[in-house]
């Protein structure tokens, strides 16, 4: 499909136009019409009802929901994607509440500073949805996309969305969405592109502590960061003052290898090798909580069970329903930005780490391989990393 740049979509929204926002194939795999409440024109909701044909909802921030006492529609949300519906509403000035103009009045009242909870009748014909506070970086839904787009256009954190359906009542997908885009002259973006746009703008790590850390491999400074998005704790082990071009090891936490010295992998040996290198040459190790290439400790152990039954490290992840590698290097890039590191000599054998850092604006100027000895227990694992995952070992 043909997609537009986020900046072009933002300009269209500020002109009062609707845009199409498409989510992931593994999620709802649908396109929604999205407009920003503050900028939408008088025909927006009528267009959504006539051409979109889906349910018209009003994504809002948590603060707006609290302001108007908009409580969840149900006590126990069993929606497959956790869509956070509140009780439906009509503005007190509307008639039946269902006309396009009544729903427009209700939506606009949600961003009126003078509106009060008493101005809304419940239930009604407009369905507010509460967005997660960290937007698409926390949940990749149309709700969060609409509120994020509103904020990016400097508008009140509220929008209007509607699923796009075909004339026969089926959901529009793929080529059908592209035809809809061209028929109505609309911009179309993906939530994935919005996630990447937000990550580029995001500064989501905060330094919480810094201490001296003597180790078996030298004396380091240890920095403790926290992600404001996930509340995860990230440790950085550093030697010397940060440089514009820095020696960097991005190490994914491996409890079994780093702590218990498991011979199933080479993680612990790589960490020790990196510490020795950084102690001698300066630089930093960013220790990310990405156990099992992002699937978590228990799932990693389940993958080990499958490996004992004949799978390799890639097919085991796939059999559990995961991609072969779920890791993202957004947080690592944020930490490097914190230290004003613009390019790195990356201590790694993994090309995906080069790509992951480059995606977030960190240049990989050079690479230092980390070569560790194989053993009888990790030989097949190492071979799979080389052949199937492209590791340079």
UniProtKB/Swiss-Prot annotation:
Catalytic site: 325, 327
> Which residues take part in binding Mg(2+) 1?
28
Cofactor(s) needed by this chain: Mg(2+); Mn(2+); Zn(2+)
Q: Which gene encodes it?
A: ribBA
EC code:
4.1.99.12, 3.5.4.25
Tell me a GO cellular component: cytosol
- InterPro entries, per this entry? DHBP_synth_RibB-like_a/b_dom, DHBP_synthase_RibB, GTP_cyclohydro_II, RibA, RibA-like_sf, Riboflavin_synth_RibBA
The UniProt keywords, alphabetically, are: GTP-binding, Hydrolase, Lyase, Magnesium, Manganese, Metal-binding, Multifunctional enzyme, Nucleotide-binding, Riboflavin biosynthesis, Zinc
| Pathway connected to this protein | Cofactor biosynthesis; riboflavin biosynthesis; 2-hydroxy-3-oxobutyl phosphate from D-ribulose 5-phosphate: step 1/1; Cofactor biosynthesis; riboflavin biosynthesis; 5-amino-6-(D-ribitylamino)uracil from GTP: step 1/4
What highest taxon heads this organism's lineage? Answer: Bacteria
Task: Give binding positions for GTP.
Answer: 249-253, 270, 291-293, 313, 348, 353
Q: Binding of D-ribulose 5-phosphate: at which residues?
A: 27-28, 32, 139-143, 163
* Catalytic activity reported: D-ribulose 5-phosphate = (2S)-2-hydroxy-3-oxobutyl phosphate + formate + H(+); GTP + 4 H2O = 2,5-diamino-6-hydroxy-4-(5-phosphoribosylamino)-pyrimidine + formate + 2 phosphate + 3 H(+)
Q: Which family does it belong to?
A: In the N-terminal section; belongs to the DHBP synthase family.
Region listing for GTP cyclohydrolase II, in residue ranges: 201-393
UniProt GO molecular function: 3,4-dihydroxy-2-butanone-4-phosphate synthase activity; GTP binding; GTP cyclohydrolase II activity; magnesium ion binding; manganese ion binding; zinc ion binding
Q: Which organism is it from?
A: Staphylococcus haemolyticus (strain JCSC1435)
Record region (DHBP synthase):
1-200
Looking up HAMAP family in the UniProt record yields: RibA (MF_00179), RibB (MF_00180), RibBA (MF_01283)
From its record, what is one biological process in GO terms? riboflavin biosynthetic process
Q: Where does Zn(2+) bind?
A: 254, 265, 267
- Note how many cofactor molecules are bound and how: Binds 2 divalent metal cations per subunit. Magnesium or manganese.
Task: Please report the name of this protein according to its UniProt entry.
Answer: Riboflavin biosynthesis protein RibBA
Task: Please give the positions of the paired cysteines in each disulfide bond.
Answer: none
